[in-house]
Amino acid sequence: MAYRRRKKKVKKCRLCEMKLDYVDYKDTRLLSEFLTDKGKIIPKRLTGTCAKHQRMVKVAIKRARQMGLLPYLKI
């Protein structure tokens, strides 16, 4: 019995499509899309962001957490 391989759906970086050069830590609406319901950062293999923008998102989320704009944990 032969198994068929699933074709992986190629996810495109939404931030590249929006042509963002900088991810602002004050944009909590955008940053909350990259967080789980418990407040953890979603990895790039699930979000589809490129490595450059994933690093920017990571730094922006950590800055927003330190400023008190985003929670560390959601209970």
Swiss-Prot record:
Q: Which SUPFAM superfamilies match?
A: Ribosomal protein S18
Listed GO CC annotations: cytosolic small ribosomal subunit
An example Gene Ontology molecular-function term: small ribosomal subunit rRNA binding
The UniProt keywords, alphabetically, are: Ribonucleoprotein, Ribosomal protein, RNA-binding, rRNA-binding
Question: What biological-process GO terms show up in the record?
Answer: translation
* InterPro entries membership: Ribosomal_bS18, Ribosomal_bS18_CS, Ribosomal_bS18_sf
Q: Which family does it belong to?
A: Belongs to the bacterial ribosomal protein bS18 family.
Q: How does it assemble?
A: Part of the 30S ribosomal subunit. Forms a tight heterodimer with protein bS6.
The protein's job, in short, is: Binds as a heterodimer with protein bS6 to the central domain of the 16S rRNA, where it helps stabilize the platform of the 30S subunit.
The record's HAMAP family line, in alphabetical order, gives: Ribosomal_bS18
Q: What is the protein's given name?
A: Small ribosomal subunit protein bS18
Lineage at the top is: Bacteria, Thermotogati, Thermotogota, Thermotogae, Thermotogales
